[in-house]
């Protein structure tokens, strides 16, 4: 059996694991990613991120290709199973001091 030597092992290649792997590799850290699924899970489990996360994506160089798959989020309403409004969370549609919109929606398998 071959001995493999990595600085970091990441378990799971979702958006967080993939982003972390890219950031570490950019800093010359050797990374092994372990993912139990052979294919991308086709249903979203995460659907939102903000301008600070977009800055992280900018750092790893994926904002141009990613922007084509994003929706600028004008807000979110949380409604219970009786149709009652629990929370109305409007988001401004203007660029923040981070250089990006404050709220984005996405389809996780696309990321």
Task: Specify the residue positions occupied by each region the protein language model found.
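Beta1/beta-strand and adjacent pyrophosphate-binding region of the FAD-binding site
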Residues: 2-16, 32
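A short, structure-level motif marking secondary-structure boundaries and short turns
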Residues: 4-6, 37-39, 96-101
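A structure-centric signal for secondary-structure junctions around beta-strands
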Residues: 5, 28, 72-75
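Glycine-rich FAD pyrophosphate-binding loop
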Residues: 9, 23-45
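Conserved structural-core and active-site-/substrate-pathway-adjacent residues in large, well-folded domains
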Residues: 10-12, 21, 57, 111
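Conserved functional loop/turn residues at catalytic and ligand-binding sites
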Residues: 12, 28, 61
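Active-site-adjacent segment of FAD-dependent monooxygenases/related oxidoreductases
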Residues: 45, 50-111
């Amino acid at each position: 059996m071959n001995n493999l030597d990595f600085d970091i092992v990441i378990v799971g290649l979702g958006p967080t694991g993939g982003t972390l792997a890219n950031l570490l590799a950019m800093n010359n850290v050797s990374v092994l990613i372990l993912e139990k699924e052979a294919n991308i899970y086709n249903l979203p489990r995460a659907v939102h991120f903000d301008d600070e996360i977009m800055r992280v994506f900018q750092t790893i160089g994926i904002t141009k290709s990613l922007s084509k798959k994003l929706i600028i989020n004008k807000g979110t309403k949380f409604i219970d199973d009786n149709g009652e409004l629990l929370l109305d969370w409007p988001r401004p549609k203007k660029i923040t001091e981070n250089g990006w919109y404050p709220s984005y929606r996405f389809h996780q398998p696309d990321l």
